[in-house]
A protein has these predicted regions:
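Conserved nucleotide-binding/hydrolysis micro-motifs of P-loop NTPases
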Residues: 78-80
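Canonical RRM/RBD RNA-binding surface and closely related RRM-like beta-sheet modules
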Residues: 1-76
């Protein structure tokens, strides 16, 4: 399942997010979206988790949780 993670602190790195998500199971990929010109985080990203049950648990427990001083939004990503 592909998961959207929003309202991230701009200092959060992919490794930081990976560490949080690994508490709920393995993740295939973690990608924080960055501005093409500046290379700075846009404050959101995506996590791909192969186990849907683990992904649903992460969504249920982490949505609206405080992380690095911000209340994050986490939900199933919508297709483009």
């Amino acid at each position: 399942m592909n998961i959207y993670v929003g309202n991230l602190n701009y200092r959060v790195r992919e490794d930081d997010l990976k560490q949080v998500m690994e508490e709920y199971g393995t993740d295939e990929s973690v990608k924080i979206i960055k501005d093409r010109e500046t290379g700075k985080s846009k404050g959101f990203g995506f996590v791909e988790m192969p186990d849907d049950e683990a992904a649903k648990k992460a969504i249920a427990e982490l949505n609206e949780a405080e992380y690095e001083g911000r209340q994050i939004v986490i939900k199933e990503a919508r297709p483009k």
